[in-house]
């Protein structure tokens, strides 16, 4: 660590004690319930002795919250916040304070999970619906998704969509030579393993003889040039190819939309709509398509449906496209997106409205025009007469001295050799423009030059069509109205600030307030990802510590922080394996073994790197079938690339033979990818790198406390053994190289760098001892829940000593035969008790997977278990004939205020039974705003952007 700090001596006031839910007295009572004499005995019964790490985890002593924040201040002081005029897809922006305080800093928003349970996610879903509406309106296209990871990833996903959907059946893709450089490198990474050829050139001439399935044009391009893309789009369409525009959202308030110009797909970043640059992220990217492509659109889509009363209700639509259902046939491996950032961007548009956005855009453009006029006066004519917010000039031999003078003014310019780029944004003042002129050698007055500036948007590219016409973008002009709107939406959702979220494989633990504080400090939030490294010294000191700690925790030798999600970490890890085999002359190794219980991202990721998936069966105990593994490893020995295995397994058990599994794969020349989704059961107790794994990703939004944000952001760094280290994802911004053994998987070299502060503080606060204790209590909590529920809902899988890991699968499938109850009924009934449901039907259809984490107290675990037991009693009443399943409170759940307020009540159970089930609170009850959502209706009547209000007024009444 960069600064030595003394450890905190008083364990009674330590952060670990507040992070971990059960008190010492609770732990003793829970151990008695699970029939273990001590936590140590329980760990010995849970983990195979062959994988236990020998030495205690050592990442330094735990710090107090005050000490940790002081340490972060010292790191922040090492970062230098210059004015960024670099551009290249990242812009300074102003997050309205009402949005910062009431969304970004509000646990009601940032601790929620992905809205798979729509009834308790209506506020978040409405915000995402606003985002989709905003994107559709600005791009002029029909359907948008609810965010992607970053612009580079969005471009790669659009390329893949074009390959699936175009009439042209070639394997070549055209890329405008003036796309953002980081986008081009991500495209190269995605294209190479799939055998797609990139043709990089000038759309004006190089498209003529090219046979391609699609083409990507930047609008405006990375130099700032604003060119009419219609001729290039027409050429692409003539070839049977799809046209993709990477478009700047703020520019689209003034210039013609991609839809008007004939584009099939639009992608880009919503970062400049109120989201800080954060040294690379997190930011919400977007993708919009014409209607014919909607079923091939990657990522999540929010649609409008109806609830059980016929009232409007939002839900995730067209989920059969996604990896958790389609696996290797999915449109993408996307799981985590950028929901929290998409919500911020949408609310930025709600806050400003169309008039406000246009005013911001006009101001930015006007100042850029003034800048250009001054540069001309100084002898530096912009390369293009048409632009929005960026100009590029040829500086020749003066380039280095201009850059140095700009840095003396605390300004960063973009540069490519002797060509200098100056990009303005909503934070740019007249003083900054004058400072930029000084860097170019001139003392000019903004007021004097302003009269010479001219509009630089050509008449044929001026926007004509209206946008953001829905009332939601007009009704919240005052901060009072905006504040109340945000509060209203937050109140509709159930997040960790209200109750435990026991989702298996999701690790919904505490996101402590202290961990979130540095996120908004300008020293972390305001850095452009491509500033000189010396200006980000504090960041790099933090990166070094994080990489060291993750290596100590995992047993690996090197770590890349670049992947922006767990799925992207999988992708990067498999690319490393692929690169390793190719470097050894074994590029023919393309078979990936995947257990049938694997998360859907695993086969989807394998497919994305050109591997062929071979499924390995599981035995009756939920473990990998060793006989089947041996047979398939032998059958594919010459072509075996890897196995992807989750540990502990997705069945919630530490498999006894994990070392044998690794040995079998290694014996046949393969590598072991160990999915780190369940690392929360291993930290301090076992290290994947010690028992045979070669590579893993670490879900920082699970094990290491980055909040889920309602569906993102997330981070998925990967750790590798030394032989794979040369094949970690590279990035030209870190070493200046344009070619790497494995190219970048994210647009920014360190992914969503700013949220790494959260995991970093968590580790500072816990220390090695605290992290280990958290793992032990996570396992104890899970075994406690299993012990309490087993007599009512049998636990499906245990190890040979009767233990589970950090999560368990309960099995109500027999109850469906005896009562007709479904897992959906149980999930919706839990809402009446104030709980989010456990994970449904994964990895075993018809079951529920529960993960309580270490952060939940015994009291909360008991409240959840009591609710589940009460639901079992309600099922028994159906079995005994008190009422049919259709007439039961289970099938009518969740119950809403509309139900309790009905003038008439004709149901077979009492009103109080439905609305206030046994053990639930009447004084602080959570009321979900809608009844059970009709999923079938939503997919058959797809609506993915705000309709005219009058269309739904009657239903709402």
From Swiss-Prot:
Q: Name one GO cellular component term.
A: cytosol
Keyword Oxidoreductase among UniProt keywords: yes
Cofactors that this protein relies on: pyridoxal 5'-phosphate
Q: Which GO terms describe its biological process?
A: glycine decarboxylation via glycine cleavage system
Show the Gene3D superfamilies listed in the entry.
Aspartate Aminotransferase, domain 1, Type I PLP-dependent aspartate aminotransferase-like (Major domain)
- Keywords for the protein's UniProt record, in alphabetical order: Oxidoreductase, Pyridoxal phosphate
Molecular function terms from GO: glycine binding; glycine dehydrogenase (decarboxylating) activity; pyridoxal phosphate binding
Return the CDD domains for the record: GDC-P
- Which residues get modified to N6-(pyridoxal phosphate)lysine? 702
InterPro entries attached here? GcvP, GDC-P_C, GDC-P_N, GDC_P, PyrdxlP-dep_Trfase, PyrdxlP-dep_Trfase_major, PyrdxlP-dep_Trfase_small
Which reaction does this enzyme catalyse, per its entry? N(6)-[(R)-lipoyl]-L-lysyl-[glycine-cleavage complex H protein] + glycine + H(+) = N(6)-[(R)-S(8)-aminomethyldihydrolipoyl]-L-lysyl-[glycine-cleavage complex H protein] + CO2
* Enzyme Commission number: 1.4.4.2
User: Per the similarity annotation, which family is this?
Assistant: Belongs to the GcvP family.
What does this protein's UniProt record list under function? The glycine cleavage system catalyzes the degradation of glycine. The P protein binds the alpha-amino group of glycine through its pyridoxal phosphate cofactor; CO(2) is released and the remaining methylamine moiety is then transferred to the lipoamide cofactor of the H protein.
Q: How does it assemble?
A: The glycine cleavage system is composed of four proteins: P, T, L and H.
PANTHER family linked: GLYCINE DEHYDROGENASE (DECARBOXYLATING), MITOCHONDRIAL, GLYCINE DEHYDROGENASE, DECARBOXYLATING
Name of the protein this chain belongs to: Glycine dehydrogenase (decarboxylating)
Species lineage, top-down? Answer: Bacteria, Pseudomonadati, Pseudomonadota, Alphaproteobacteria, Hyphomicrobiales
């Amino acid at each position: 660590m960069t600064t030595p700090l003394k450890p905190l001596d008083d364990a009674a006031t330590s952060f670990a004690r507040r992070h971990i839910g059960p008190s010492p007295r609770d732990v003793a009572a829970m151990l008695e319930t699970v029939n273990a004499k001590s936590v140590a005995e329980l760990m010995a019964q849970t983990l195979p002795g062959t994988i236990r790490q020998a030495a205690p985890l050592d990442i330094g002593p735990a710090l107090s919250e005050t000490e940790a924040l002081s340490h972060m201040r010292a790191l922040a002081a090492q970062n230098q916040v210059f004015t960024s005029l670099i551009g290249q897809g990242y812009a300074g922006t102003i997050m309205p304070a009402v949005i910062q305080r009431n969304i970004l800093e509000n646990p009601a928003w940032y601790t929620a999970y992905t809205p798979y349970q729509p009834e308790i996610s209506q506020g978040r879903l409405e915000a995402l619906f606003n985002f989709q509406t905003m994107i559709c309106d600005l791009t002029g296209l029909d359907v948008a998704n609810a965010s992607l990871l970053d612009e580079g990833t969005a471009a790669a996903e659009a390329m893949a969509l074009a390959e699936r959907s175009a009439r042209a059946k070639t394997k070549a893709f055209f890329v405008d030579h003036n796309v953002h450089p980081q986008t081009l490198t991500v495209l190269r990474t995605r294209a190479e393993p799939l055998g797609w050829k990139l043709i990089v050139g000038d759309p004006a001439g190089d498209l003529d003889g090219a046979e391609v399935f699609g083409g990507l044009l930047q609008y405006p391009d990375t130099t700032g040039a604003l060119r009419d893309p219609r001729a290039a789009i027409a050429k692409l369409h003539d070839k049977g190819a799809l046209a993709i525009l990477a478009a700047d959202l703020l520019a689209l308030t003034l210039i013609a939309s991609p839809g008007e110009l004939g584009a099939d797909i639009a992608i880009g970043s919503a970062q400049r709509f109120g989201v800080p640059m954060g040294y690379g992220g997190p930011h919400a990217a977007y993708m919009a398509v014409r209607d014919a492509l909607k079923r091939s659109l990657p990522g999540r889509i929010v649609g409008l449906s109806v609830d059980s009363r016929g009232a409007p209700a939002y839900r995730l639509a067209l989920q059969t496209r996604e990896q958790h259902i389609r696996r290797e046939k999915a449109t993408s491996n996307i799981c985590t997106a950028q929901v929290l950032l998409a919500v911020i961007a949408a609310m930025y548009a709600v806050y400003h409205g169309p008039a406000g956005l246009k005013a911001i855009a006009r101001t930015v453009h006007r100042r850029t025009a003034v800048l250009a006029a001054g540069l001309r006066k100084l002898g530096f004519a912009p390369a293009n007469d048409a632009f929005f917010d960026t100009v590029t000039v040829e500086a020749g031999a003066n380039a280095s001295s201009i850059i140095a003078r700009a840095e003396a003014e605390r300004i960063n310019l973009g540069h490519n050799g002797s060509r200098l780029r100056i990009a303005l944004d909503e934070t740019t003042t007249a003083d900054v423009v004058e400072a930029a002129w000084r860097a170019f050698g001139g003392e000019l007055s903004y007021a004097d030059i302003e009269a010479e500036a001219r509009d630089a948007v050509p008449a044929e590219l001026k926007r004509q069509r209206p946008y953001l016409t829905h009332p939601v973008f007009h009704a919240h002009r005052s901060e009072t109205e905006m504040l109340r709107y945000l509060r209203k939406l937050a109140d509709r959702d159930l997040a960790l600030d209200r109750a435990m979220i026991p989702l298996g494989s999701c690790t919904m633990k505490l996101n402590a307030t202290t961990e979130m504080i540095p996120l908004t400090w300008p020293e972390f939030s305001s850095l452009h990802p491509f500033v000189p490294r010396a200006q980000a010294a504090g960041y790099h000191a933090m990166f070094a510590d994080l990489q060291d700690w993750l290596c100590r925790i995992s047993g690996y030798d090197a770590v890349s922080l670049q992947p922006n999600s767990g799925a992207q970490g999988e992708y990067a890890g498999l690319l490393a394996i692929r690169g390793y085999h190719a470097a050894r002359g074994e590029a023919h190794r393309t078979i990936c073994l995947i257990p049938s219980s694997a998360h859907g991202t695993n086969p989807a990721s394998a497919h994305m790197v050109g591997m062929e998936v071979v499924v390995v069966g599981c035995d009756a105990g939920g473990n990998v079938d060793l006989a089947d593994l041996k047979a398939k490893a032998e059958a594919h020995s010459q072509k075996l690339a890897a196995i992807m295995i989750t540990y502990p397994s997705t069945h919630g058990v530490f498999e006894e033979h994990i070392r044998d599994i690794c040995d079998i794969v290694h014996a046949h020349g393969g590598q072991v990818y160990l999915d780190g989704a369940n690392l929360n059961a291993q930290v301090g107790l076992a290290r994947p790198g010690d028992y045979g794994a070669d590579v893993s990703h670490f879900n920082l939004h699970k094990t290491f406390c980055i909040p889920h944000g309602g569906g993102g952001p997330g981070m998925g760094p990967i750790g590798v053994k030394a032989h794979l280290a040369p094949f970690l994802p590279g990035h030209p911004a870190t070493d200046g190289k344009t070619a790497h053994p494995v190219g970048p998987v994210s647009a920014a070299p360190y992914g969503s760098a700013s949220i790494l502060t959260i995991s970093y503080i968590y580790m500072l606060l816990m220390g090695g001892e605290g992290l280990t204790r958290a793992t032990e209590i996570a396992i104890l909590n899970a075994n406690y829940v299993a012990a309490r529920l087993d007599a009512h809902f049998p636990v499906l899988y245990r190890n040979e000593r009767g233990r589970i890991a950090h999560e368990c699968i309960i099995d109500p499938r027999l109850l469906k035969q005896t009562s007709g109850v479904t897992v959906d009924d149980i999930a919706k009934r839990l809402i009446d008790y104030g709980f989010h449901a456990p994970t449904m039907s994964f990895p075993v259809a018809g079951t529920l997977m529960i993960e309580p984490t270490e952060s939940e107290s015994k009291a909360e675990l008991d409240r959840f278990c009591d609710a589940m037991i009460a639901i079992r009693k309600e099922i028994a009443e159906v079995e005994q004939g008190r009422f049919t399943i259709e007439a039961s409170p289970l099938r009518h759940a969740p119950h809403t205020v509309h139900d309790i307020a009905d003038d008439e009540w004709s149901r077979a159970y009492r009103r109080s039974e439905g609305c206030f089930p046994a053990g639930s609170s009447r004084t602080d009850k959570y009321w979900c705003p809608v009844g059970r959502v009709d999923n079938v209706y939503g997919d058959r009547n797809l609506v993915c952007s705000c309709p005219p209000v009058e269309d739904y007024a009657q239903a709402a009444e």
